Amino acid sequence: MLPARLPFRLLSLFLRGSAPTAARHGLREPLLERRCAAASSFQHSSSLGRELPYDPVDTEGFGEGGDMQERFLFPEYILDPEPQPTREKQLQELQQQQEEEERQRQQRREERRQQNLRARSREHPVVGHPDPALPPSGVNCSGCGAELHCQDAGVPGYLPREKFLRTAEADGGLARTVCQRCWLLSHHRRALRLQVSREQYLELVSAALRRPGPSLVLYMVDLLDLPDALLPDLPALVGPKQLIVLGNKVDLLPQDAPGYRQRLRERLWEDCARAGLLLAPGHQGPQRPVKDEPQDGENPNPPNWSRTVVRDVRLISAKTGYGVEELISALQRSWRYRGDVYLVGATNAGKSTLFNTLLESDYCTAKGSEAIDRATISPWPGTTLNLLKFPICNPTPYRMFKRHQRLKKDSTQAEEDLSEQEQNQLNVLKKHGYVVGRVGRTFLYSEEQKDNIPFEFDADSLAFDMENDPVMGTHKSTKQVELTAQDVKDAHWFYDTPGITKENCILNLLTEKEVNIVLPTQSIVPRTFVLKPGMVLFLGAIGRIDFLQGNQSAWFTVVASNILPVHITSLDRADALYQKHAGHTLLQIPMGGKERMAGFPPLVAEDIMLKEGLGASEAVADIKFSSAGWVSVTPNFKDRLHLRGYTPEGTVLTVRPPLLPYIVNIKGQRIKKSVAYKTKKPPSLMYNVRKKKGKINV
């Protein structure tokens, strides 16, 4: 075994070198110092070296190096470079990464699905159970007027047992509570079918109208449904009452020519006369036609006081407010405060919308406007199931004077002078209707003012108290207001009656989703097509017109909901197209595929012969598909057309004189290589607002 000093001696000999080498490179001491310094620095930088204990060695020949240490050094260990991953390994890692990302996506997708399921369960909370043992509450639903109960889910006014008991035990009880059906209609546009027959509707309305005392009837008519909107049994239902006919939804009809609203009003007068209503003397409509010979026992000349008399006919839009302020002024001037007022009409005529509009107007007392909830509004027929009411404001001279001042001030305001909120509201209404009006309030009930009054005034005494005038404003009090016995003492009421269901109506065959598509909610944009004999027009899968014979082409203008599809095909392909696409996307209504069409009534044909054409700019007839809309037909001059119309079995196909005879002119250029024309929407008009140039719309 070698001695421990041997490595050091070998190192010393190596460093000492030979004399010639030392002579060539200079003195040995500097070289030794440099190498020792390098060794020392290398020792400190290395983590693998270790310092040896000092041992004196022979330093002869090193000069003054007796205190020098010798160190044993290891070079720093450097790891070998890792080999580069192979292509197979890279592909494997990439595949694992993709699988992990896909797993995370699947997890997020499943979480979103669970959230949607929970959200849908909240959107359709038809939960709870009925309890036939609990008696009815005696409190009416504030949305539809039905008595609240928890006995049967198919009876109007139903609340689940849990909700019924929880609400009854809370503060305030069931007051101002809506039933389950109204809640679903208001929040989710979802309707529950109820077991209410047409006879029950008629019995309820007839009992209300035959209450003792003077009363006025406002009969609301859907202009889109003329002449079917006028009920044939209306005189027997109303009895010897004074009647004002309101043509609603005028905002949905475009202006086909100047003076179209006056023509619509005259048309409504004519339809009232055809329906057997007695027109009041001095009216501006046509004279009542002569009836057939009276039957045995019938008075050939019944007195006017025993008949239903039409006092006036007006066009309004309960949604956009057009004509509502004029209606209020007419009621306050003519009827004043002589008795109750009843709003009557068929289902989906817009009665509840007008009820809510009048509730926020001068026709309702200021306190009643804040104390009574709004009626439920929905396109689903039969929303109102019982009587809703609000107290009518007594039109005293002072109130009439203040109202006239407000209306005069409003008419001088330009649209740019209105508040931003009111401008936004009017802009929204312009998108929904062709004519828009403003409905405001002159007086606002103030709860703070009431607290300062030592005792309660009734409506009349408060109107004549000049020191305690009702506060002007447009915002409702945030506090809950309740009508007291003094408020309703000797009051006259405005009643919203349930809608009378129409027989042979196509809406009775449709689901709630289909009703929302068929019934128009925005201004109707007419769609015009030029057809040749042998062509067929489909209005969804609920209406069809075959062009069988004619000397020339004719124009067919569809006046229906803008989202109800229209499809044109040839006569030899029409049956196959209906069999293939009825219930699917192309025709859209009805929807639900073969299962839906299996229970849907088949289309029934009816031949139609039209009179000679009046030219390319004037229609000769409207072919109306129940409440789904109509097609206005415009043949060429002196051309006679033979058509065939189809509607579902159990519904009515009506051929009437054109309601808008010049509507064919509301079209753009013809689309190249197509039978369709580009649509054109007329502008909307604002009323009771001054234009920019200082001109007032009246």
Curated annotation (Swiss-Prot):
Source organism per UniProt: Homo sapiens (Human)
Signal peptide from the UniProt entry: none
Residues in CP-type G domain copies: 202-503
Keywords per UniProt: Apoptosis, GTP-binding, Membrane, Mitochondrion, Mitochondrion inner membrane, Nucleotide-binding, Phosphoprotein
Cellular compartments annotated: Mitochondrion inner membrane
Gene3D superfamilies assigned: P-loop containing nucleotide triphosphate hydrolases
Name under which the protein is recorded: Nitric oxide-associated protein 1
Gene behind this protein: NOA1
Membership in a protein family: Belongs to the TRAFAC class YlqF/YawG GTPase family. NOA1 subfamily.
Function: Involved in regulation of mitochondrial protein translation and respiration. Plays a role in mitochondria-mediated cell death. May act as a scaffolding protein or stabilizer of respiratory chain supercomplexes. Binds GTP.
A GO term, aspect molecular function: GTP binding
Compositionally biased spans, kind Basic and acidic residues: 102-126
Subunit comment: Homodimer or multimer. Interacts with mitochondrial complex I, DAP3, MRPL12 and MRPS27.
One Gene Ontology term from the biological process aspect of the record: apoptotic process
